[in-house]
Each structure stands twice: as C-alpha cells, then as structure tokens.
C-alpha cells in the first residue's frame, strides 16, 4: 500500500508538467484525503452519538425527548466540523494561497 501511495505522489509531478500545476495537483490529493478523513471521523462520531442516545432512551424512556434534543445539537456540531473541512478544501482548490 505504501508503494502505491508513493508511486501516485511521485508521478503526480510528472503528470502535471508546470511548476504551479504540481502544487495544484498535490492540493487536490491533500484535499481529497483530508475531506475523506473528516467525513470518516464525522460518520464514526454520528454513529456513536446515535448509539448512545438509543441506549439511553432504552434505559430510561422518560427522558427520550431530552436525549433526542441533545443528540440533534451534537450531530449539528459534528457535521459542522465536516463542513469546515469542506470549506478549507474548496479554498485550497479554487483560491489556492500557495500559488501566490
């Protein structure tokens, strides 16, 4: 797996011949990996939040509505982190500050 990653990163420079294009190609790779990791972390966090809410509601059905409200607030905060990663990726891809 490491050999494939190094091969892709090494050949990206030759695939895009110009100097500015090399930075842009690495930005695309980094943006894709970063956004994928952010989405993965967000999905794991949302799954854990939903599991904890369902478990709490099963233990004490009387507080189910309060737990649901808290869960929705937590899900919004988790999703906000993924949206921040998307915004940073879009900035790096379209208004790349490294290109000057």
UniProtKB/Swiss-Prot annotation:
Its main location: membrane. One of its GO terms (cellular component) is proton-transporting two-sector ATPase complex, proton-transporting domain. The keyword 4Fe-4S does not apply. GO terms for molecular function: lipid binding; proton-transporting ATP synthase activity, rotational mechanism. The chain crosses the membrane at residues 27-47, 72-92. Pfam families: ATP-synt_C. It is a multi-pass membrane protein. The record marks 79 as: Reversibly protonated during proton transport. InterPro entries: ATP_synth_csu_bac/chlpt, ATP_synth_F0_csu, ATP_synth_F0_csu_DDCD_BS, ATP_synth_F0_csu_sf, ATPase_proteolipid_c-like_dom, F/V-ATP_Csub_sf. It comes from the Bacteria. Keywords: ATP synthesis, Cell inner membrane, Cell membrane, CF(0), Hydrogen ion transport, Ion transport, Lipid-binding, Membrane, Transmembrane, Transmembrane helix, Transport. SUPFAM superfamilies: F1F0 ATP synthase subunit C. The keyword Transport applies. It is found in: Cell inner membrane. F-type ATPases have 2 components, F(1) - the catalytic core - and F(0) - the membrane proton channel. F(1) has five subunits: alpha(3), beta(3), gamma(1), delta(1), epsilon(1). F(0) has three main subunits: a(1), b(2) and c(10-14). The alpha and beta chains form an alternating ring which encloses part of the gamma chain. F(1) is attached to F(0) by a central stalk formed by the gamma and epsilon chains, while a peripheral stalk is formed by the delta and b chains. Belongs to the ATPase C chain family. F(1)F(0) ATP synthase produces ATP from ADP in the presence of a proton or sodium gradient. F-type ATPases consist of two structural domains, F(1) containing the extramembraneous catalytic core and F(0) containing the membrane proton channel, linked together by a central stalk and a peripheral stalk. During catalysis, ATP synthesis in the catalytic domain of F(1) is coupled via a rotary mechanism of the central stalk subunits to proton translocation. Key component of the F(0) channel; it plays a direct role in translocation across the membrane. A homomeric c-ring of between 10-14 subunits forms the central stalk rotor element with the F(1) delta and epsilon subunits. This is ATP synthase subunit c. It comes from Campylobacter concisus (strain 13826).
């Amino acid at each position: 797996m490491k050999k494939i990653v190094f091969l892709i990163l090494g050949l990206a420079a030759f695939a895009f011949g110009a100097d500015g294009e090399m930075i842009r190609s690495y930005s695309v790779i980094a943006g894709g990996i970063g956004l994928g990791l952010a989405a993965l972390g967000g999905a794991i966090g949302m799954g854990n939040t939903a599991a904890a809410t369902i478990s709490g509601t099963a233990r004490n059905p009387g507080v189910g509505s309060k737990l649901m409200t808290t869960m929705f607030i937590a899900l919004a905060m988790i999703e906000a982190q993924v949206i921040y990663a998307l915004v940073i990726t879009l900035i790096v891809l379209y208004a790349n500050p490294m290109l000057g």
